[in-house]
Amino acid sequence: MMQTGLDFTLVEDLVAGVDEVGRGPLCGAVVTAAVILDPTRPILGLNDSKKLTEARREKLYVEIQEKALCWFIARAEVEEIDQLNILHATMLAMQRAVEGLSITPRLALIDGNRCPQLSVPSAPVVKGDSKVPAIAAASILAKVSRDREMAAFELIYPGYGIGGHKGYPTPVHLEALARLGPTPIHRRSFAPVRAAHEARATIMMGGSISPSVGLLQD
């Protein structure tokens, strides 16, 4: 299927696009990216990362880094998500992405309906990753970066299927969580993780099960 991209002539000088990946998963960091595209160096096929194949995202990931005026990938860790909540952690990670840019944008366009506190003017754009090329580019950088990290965690924490579901609460993930217990990269503030942790702790206290290598440590 032909994957058409956004109109690159929409790119404006020194406007950063900002997006996040990983608000919904039960494990791993929330990853953000900020990108300022170069209007003189077109990138064909930019679109919401979720609308692209993995192979296309990987190619665009390299091309964006080569052709953009500047870009920065940031994150908020699991501990920050649990401490702040996922919304505030996402805003913090977006703030870090914009602050990490080597060029100060005159405007930051944020995917979604709210903006983090920034030192530059900003505006939210609902479904911006399918409207604004710079936001689409940011969504690609964030998604490829996070997906690669999840693939690495698959090797560190086998049995959970993390490389496949990327941490999202699929039946496979929920079953593994109940069977194996949470890992150190699971978000304890998320209800399914907390429930699995408490259930497993209760069973262990009863002496009927030995600790799993994946079990969260207090």
Swiss-Prot record:
Residue ranges occupied by any RNase H type-2 domain in the UniProt entry: 13-202
Name by which UniProt lists this protein: Ribonuclease HII
Keywords: Cytoplasm, Endonuclease, Hydrolase, Manganese, Metal-binding, Nuclease
PANTHER family noted in UniProt: RIBONUCLEASE H2 SUBUNIT A (PTHR10954), RIBONUCLEASE HII (PTHR10954:SF18)
Class of this enzyme: hydrolase
Family under the similarity heading: Belongs to the RNase HII family.
Cofactor note: Manganese or magnesium. Binds 1 divalent metal ion per monomer in the absence of substrate. May bind a second metal ion after substrate binding.
Binding positions for a divalent metal cation per the UniProt entry: 19-20, 111
Any one Gene Ontology cellular component term annotated for this protein: cytoplasm
Catalysed reactions, semicolon-separated: Endonucleolytic cleavage to 5'-phosphomonoester
Highest rank taxon of the organism: Bacteria
Pfam families linked to this entry: RNase_HII
GO biological process: DNA replication, removal of RNA primer; mismatch repair
Function description: Endonuclease that specifically degrades the RNA of RNA-DNA hybrids.
Gene3D superfamilies on file: Ribonuclease H-like superfamily/Ribonuclease H (3.30.420.10)
Main location as per UniProt: cytoplasm
Matches recorded under InterPro entries: RNase_HII, RNase_HII/HIII, RNase_HII/HIII_dom, RNaseH-like_sf, RNaseH_sf
Gene: rnhB
